[in-house]
Amino acid sequence: MPARLLILAAGMGHRFGGLKQLEAVGPGGTVLMDYTVFDALRSGFDRIVLVIRRETEDAIHSHVESGFGRRVHVDYAFQELDVSRSKPWGTAQAVLAARDALDGPFAVANADDYYGAPAIEAMGRFLSSDPDPGWAMVGYRMVDALPVDGAVSRARVRVEDGWMRSIEELHGVSRECDFDAGTQVSMNLWGFDRDFLRHLERGWQEFLKGEPGADDEYALPVAVGAIAAATPNRVRVLAAQSRWCGMTSPADREDVRRTLTELISQGRYPERLWE
């Protein structure tokens, strides 16, 4: 069964100062998720699912329908905002918000990250390798997953024999920090069979029992890490073989645009993606 690509596009963008999911970074107003979808369609994915917020529905729908929405079926799911909170419940809960649109294997990606064609291709091969492929993540070398300037948070992954053993959130990481050259991190590019949703729902209910605060989130790396710690050889780690770039802060715009300009000049992407 061809896999779905689930794109998480419900973030608030407080640090960025706007809707970074729709920040134009390429020719013709293309945004980062356009390049992820382009790579996905070349890698065997046959449907896109977007998790968004109600208040951004019109803007995102307009962008999608004028671009990749003309090439592939797109489903929309909504991550609702509780009245007691100022931000969504996090990336794991966002996946659960889309469960009705996921009827088979699927990949998860952020709307505001560029993963590189080799990473998307690796995930496509994994998900199409078996009717029940299991779970996987794409691991990036830390050095390939940091912005040019500034400090960020990264999910460091401990890998043994190609399997994820643990995942730990690190804060304040920058290019000035000392870290082992082989350190791998997750940039939230995951692949799952549909049974994963059952485990995720169970974890969500446990999370709620802990009476989370107004700023607490049910994050996908934490949810997957808890399951992987209890079940050895659960999550395969695939090598990215590409460099990440993304929109964490406004200072990242020029690096992202420069990266995409180089890739277009090398013939990796057409100048006009959807024409």
Regions found by a protein language model. Name each.
Residues G116-W190, R194:
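Conserved core of the sugar-phosphate nucleotidyltransferase
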Residues R42, A59-I60, P118, H199, ...:
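Phosphate- and divalent-cation-binding pockets in alpha/beta enzyme and binding domains
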Residues R4, D46-I48, H73, P105, ...:
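Residues at the starts of beta-strands that form the adenosine-phosphate
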Residues M1-P2, P133, E160-W163, G172-E275:
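Left-handed beta-helix
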Residues F68-P105:
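Short phosphate-binding loop-to-helix
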Residues G104-Y114:
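Short beta-strand-to-loop acidic/aromatic patch adjacent to the donor-nucleotide binding site
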Residues G13, Y114-G116:
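A short, conserved beta-strand element in the Rossmann-like catalytic core
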Residues M1-V64, V83:
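N-terminal glycine-rich phosphate-binding loop and ensuing alpha1 helix
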